[in-house]
Amino acid sequence: MKKILVLYYSMYGHIERMAEAVAEGARSVPGVEVTLKRVPETMPEEVARKAGAKLDQAAPPAEPKELADYDAILFGTPTRFGNMAGQMRNFLDQTGGLWVSGALVGKFASVFTSTGTGGGSETTITSFWHTLAHHGMVIVGLPYVLPELSDVSEPRGGSPYGAATIAGADGSRRPSEKELILASFQGAHVARLVVRMQ
């Protein structure tokens, strides 16, 4: 049984929902065991609460050393000025021991994101790739095999770099059905690749 981790940071719940869809997609592939975890919040609870953060997320927090236990990891983060959120960056910066030991070499990695109005989604995903490449991971995107990825009939996130959702300037927009389809497919796509490598 191949093991897949969906690891995310979500402040307002958009990436949490996308992560659930990614995990659902991965679970649809026989031969994989999927775990959903989040990176710890680095803001003091009072500050996060005042900012309107969603603090009641069901996924348990992960520890950096756990990454070595999985055959593939799908990372989810909101966009912060075209980069990953600081909480995710902080988590990844604690993986130096895994890098030294080569614990992540050859494992699959994929990234999904959210933005306010669409700007920065692709650079957020590619901002991950430097770290993943240094770890020797195999980077997986979102191929143009789904009609939803080419459908421009409504605003939506997502590109061949990875699934994405547009939250709106005030954060009120939730992931759309098409965005969730893309997220689910990304999870399934990674799972199929992992199973093939047996």
Curated annotation (Swiss-Prot):
Residues that, per the record, bind FMN: 10-15, 79-81, 114-119, 134
Any GO molecular function: NAD binding
Keyword NAD tagged: yes
Domain Flavodoxin-like: 4-190
Chain residues that bind NAD(+): 12
Cofactor: FMN
Protein name, per record: NAD(P)H dehydrogenase (quinone)
